[in-house]
Amino acid sequence: MSNSNTIAHRLKRLRMSRGLSLDALVASMGHVVTKQALSKYECGKANPSPIVLNKLADTFKVKASYFLREPQVSVKFIGYRKASSLSRKDQDRIESLVTEVLEDRVNLQAMTGWPNGNHLPIHAHRISKIEDTERAAEELRTNWTLGQDPISSMVGMLEDHHIHVIEIDAIDKFDGICAVAVDEVTRSQAAGLVTSKGVSGERQRLSLAHELGHLVLKIGSGLDEEKAAFRFGAAFLAPAQVVYREIGTKRDTILSEELLLFKKRFGMSVQALVRRLFDLKIISEGYYRHWMMLINRLKWKRKEPGELEPEQSQWLRQTALRAYAEGLITREEVEGLLGEPLDVEEPLTLIERRAFMKLPLEERRRILSEQADKLKSHYSDGADRSDLQNGDFVEH
């Protein structure tokens, strides 16, 4: 990819991920460039000057070199769940943002030695009928040694199995998305499951389980992908044998108090639990419809009693702080990844390096000369190289 194409690709994606029009970008840059010029940059017909490139970098809070660096991965969206009224502009913004975030995660994986996504079970579970989702959910639980107990943290479990959980600010019409980052020979490097910020914990958990279904299921022709993914998600959160044991194999009635207890137990909404009972033929179709009308009348579709707190991702913060502590990325890069100011002490290596650079030039030369003499003596004596792990060597 040429410099022009790389800049064009990066610029357009950044603009769309921020939901900016060309006019809005011109305004945010203080009108140092015209809308027509920006359009040419995005089409690869012209390159911005160094001054304009630096202004773009300041506007988007990235380094200028970001625009010149070729993407190491491309992102494919293998599951996109949205309302029909979601505009193309909103869809482009969401996809651009997810692409940007997932590329950053892949880079962070690489620099910290985190396993890539070659081993992920992408489309590994083939189903030909809706009931096969029960088997697929059970197989995945077995492969991941999860047992049959309810999953206490969906986010933590997914991150333990190298699947990124990404929360974004999105309009109400957005439900979720599943994406895979692949390298130049289409080997998977990472997967991401995306949900909206600000949703309840039970909705977040089912949304993640639903998107996990899009990721791992190979759905046969003629099957409704959304229904299959939903059934898989419910089966993954509430395995059939556990539901039969704790709720029963046949129920003519069930109390709302019971459902609220099971809501906490399985981390699922009352509405999703009632549907689960119907799918497992524990309740009749008539009784299922009765509960759906009751949920509508109580307005529980909008807000249920006993809402669970949304789960929080730990991988990004933990890994970004590790990379910062090891001197692999700067404070500004950490803040860009986390989207917030960093309130931690500077790593000792950075403090030492800055203290060293403040010394007079002659003093720095003396220290470096002494270190060079020590190394020369070390090698001439045939010392074991493992000894280099000890001692106070100053980076410069």
State where each predicted segment sits.
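Active-site hotspot residues in diverse enzymes, especially metal/ion-binding acidic/histidine motifs
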Residues: M1-L348
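Short linear interaction segments
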Residues: R364-H396
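Short, charge-rich, low-complexity interaction segments located
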Residues: V73-K76, E346-E370
